[in-house]
Amino acid sequence: MDYFKTSIDQLHEQLRSGKVTSSQLVDETLAGINQLDAEVDAFLALNADGAKEKAAAVDAAGIADDQPLAGVPIAIKDNIVTKGVVTTAASKILANFNPIYDATVIQKLDAAGAINVGKTNMDEFAMGSSTENSAFKTTKNAWDHTRVPGGSSGGSAAAVAAGEVIAALGSDTGGSIRQPAAFNGIVGVKPTYGRVSRWGLIAFSSSLDQIGTLTRHVKDAAQLLNVIAGHDERDSTTADTPVPDFTAKIGQDIKGMKIALPKEYLGKGVDPAVADKIKAAAKQFEDMGATVTEVSLPHTQYAVPSYYIIASSEASSNLQRFDGIRYGFRAKDVKNIEDVYVRSRSEGFGPEVKRRIMLGTFSLSAGFYDAYFKKAGQVRTLITRDFEDVFKDYDLIIGPTTPTVAFKIGEKVTDPVTMYMNDILTIPVNLAGLPAASVPAGFVDGMPVGLQLIGKHFDESTIFQVAAAFEAQNDYLAQIPGGK
């Protein structure tokens, strides 16, 4: 199956008409992954037997008109638990962890007839911006195999961009869906915090994590979000609010819409060539009848330090459960119980995870709590208020997803602060709990540029409306990555 020339709607029609069966589609997809992934390294594990069994069941039951995902193979980021399929979070400490239940999003996909074909690579415990922190392999950018795919959902993004699957799930804590989507020239959507259940998502930072989508087409993302969104009694952070049809506003014009462009998002540190692509996108929106006005989000500069204190502090707490006792990796030849804890965690966690655990533990300690964690929370409030002030007068905020295009593998891995700053434009959205998407906005030196669209709380529909209008005006998807 040529996923470069196919949307979920087109795939649904082929499956409904009998032009292709789900079993054939799964076989073709698995064969394509086995061929392409030798270079891309997007997958950690394939669910071949489970996918074939599910496909046969879908073929036997038939596909209804209102089941656009039925029979469609989808990849899953490896921090979303899947019953019977090893789930590692790309960490040695969970190398052989076989979950006994499915995450809520997996249950919803299964009920919709979608097929999990495999688990994708990521930065260990979703901590990273390049997928170089995986304990198992380094995923390559679909456009240039010497460059990173972004992170932490780099495997999911590369798999979609390389044409291995039509769609994938990822998670976004500080940009982990949008940044790899931008680096690989695809659509990445982070829903509003609380829109999608986190039950079954291996926790990194509980107040920031959110499951979202990676696809080539805007409507595909909306259809996927239609299935996975909604309140879940097992996750108290999910919002008990109605879930609209996210495809409803796709195709509507954007005439009269008021769009904000923060001056901080085109300032120091942003590649001028990337900034030019965003300015060109703003001009396109104006040509479509919208107004684009420069605004200010003055506390953007404090987002990265605030985020790394909050996220690391929550990670320090969340990762206490990985102790070598209940499940996961356990060190051998230990002398006593303390040795089990110390050696299992020392040998099981990678350097970036240990760095963040130590930072978080320090920030939460009695002598530094007020100076660091409490202060970071206050900055988070200021960043949220910045967005609230802008959204009093505007429908949407736009800007670059990342300051630069994808960087070379190994280029930033020894300089964590430089790596962290790559997420400066995506992190504020997570701190404020807002929905946002990255859509293709052109190329710089042959590498994709992402346009970030930020919406009001629980207004993903406007993001999809504007993203689809922008997509329809451009032919960026006509260019296909070939790797190098």
From Swiss-Prot:
UniProt GO MF annotations: ATP binding; glutaminyl-tRNA synthase (glutamine-hydrolyzing) activity
Chemical reaction(s) catalysed? L-glutamyl-tRNA(Gln) + L-glutamine + ATP + H2O = L-glutaminyl-tRNA(Gln) + L-glutamate + ADP + phosphate + H(+)
Q: Which UniProt keywords apply?
A: ATP-binding, Ligase, Nucleotide-binding, Protein biosynthesis
Under the heading PROSITE patterns, the entry gives: AMIDASES
Q: What is its EC number?
A: 6.3.5.7
Q: Which InterPro entries match?
A: Amidase, Amidase_CS, Amidase_dom, AS_sf, GatA
Query: Per the record's keyword annotation, is DNA damage included, yes or no?
Result: no
Name the GO terms of the biological process aspect. Answer: translation
* Recorded GO CC terms: glutamyl-tRNA(Gln) amidotransferase complex
User: Residues of the signal sequence?
Assistant: none
Q: What class of enzyme is it?
A: ligase
How does it associate, per the subunit comment? Heterotrimer of A, B and C subunits.
Annotated family: Belongs to the amidase family. GatA subfamily.
Q: What does this protein do?
A: Allows the formation of correctly charged Gln-tRNA(Gln) through the transamidation of misacylated Glu-tRNA(Gln) in organisms which lack glutaminyl-tRNA synthetase. The reaction takes place in the presence of glutamine and ATP through an activated gamma-phospho-Glu-tRNA(Gln).
Checking PANTHER family in the record gives:
GLUTAMYL-TRNA(GLN) AMIDOTRANSFERASE SUBUNIT A, TRANSAMIDASE
Q: What is the protein name for this chain?
A: Glutamyl-tRNA(Gln) amidotransferase subunit A
| Record organism | Lacticaseibacillus paracasei (strain ATCC 334 / BCRC 17002 / CCUG 31169 / CIP 107868 / KCTC 3260 / NRRL B-441)
